[in-house]
A protein has these predicted regions:
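Short donor-sugar binding/catalytic loops of nucleotide-sugar-dependent glycosyltransferases
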Residues: 47-52, 66, 80, 104
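Nucleotide-activated donor-binding/catalytic signature segment of Leloir-type glycosyltransferases, i.e.
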Residues: 71-78, 83-110
């Protein structure tokens, strides 16, 4: 993205963590039960900032499309400038296959991520600079596949596909995103 900088001056320094077996104070779906999240569906989680850069309108389109399914459930956890907008969407639509959780203590959030099956990353399709959301790390730490809908300038999706841990489409492409959901079920 910066052709004026020579390749010899650029170094990739990837984020990394050690993967260990994790212990949770919840077992047998206790946390899911506490949060009224079903245990008999594939659980897809979006956790983090709910702001304009995340393309919340497309996330809401995905949640609406998911209402036609009976085997998947979307868990949205977070806060941000667009929280009111998505909260209003939940009040107006009362979806059966998704929930909105405003925030959780870190350990409880980590336990929730580990109880889910698929991670989600959304970015607004109007981004013009690369963006690499850090929420990916908690998904990878839990060895979960990741579905991504981002702009064309962010390379997180192609990197995920190349390395076999996720699927990607451009944000706004609802048909392909729902095909990705079907693929992971």
């Amino acid at each position: 993205h910066n052709p004026s900088i020579t390749a010899e001056r650029v170094e990739v320094c990837p984020n990394s963590i050690e993967l260990y077996g994790k212990e949770s104070e919840y077992n047998n779906g206790g946390l899911l039960q506490k949060l009224n999240i079903p245990t008999d569906k594939l659980l897809l989680i979006y956790g983090g900032n709910l702001g304009r850069p995340q393309g919340i309108d497309f996330l809401m389109d995905v949640l609406a499309a998911n209402e036609k399914r009976t085997d998947t459930y979307f868990v949205v956890v977070g806060n941000g400038t667009e929280y009111g907008k998505i909260s209003q969407w939940f009040r107006n639509n009362t979806p059966h296959n998704s929930c909105l959780i405003p925030s959780l203590p870190k350990q409880e959030y980590d336990d929730l991520v580990s109880a889910c099956n698929v991670g989600l990353i959304f970015l607004d399709n109007r981004f013009t600079i690369p963006n690499y959301p850090s929420r990916l790390l908690s998904y990878l730490e839990n060895r979960m596949p990741v579905l991504m809908a981002t702009d064309m300038n962010t390379d997180i999706g192609p990197i995920a596909e190349k390395n076999g841990y996720g699927l990607w489409t451009e944000s706004g492409n609802l048909e392909t995103f729902m095909e990705m959901v079907e693929f992971v079920t």
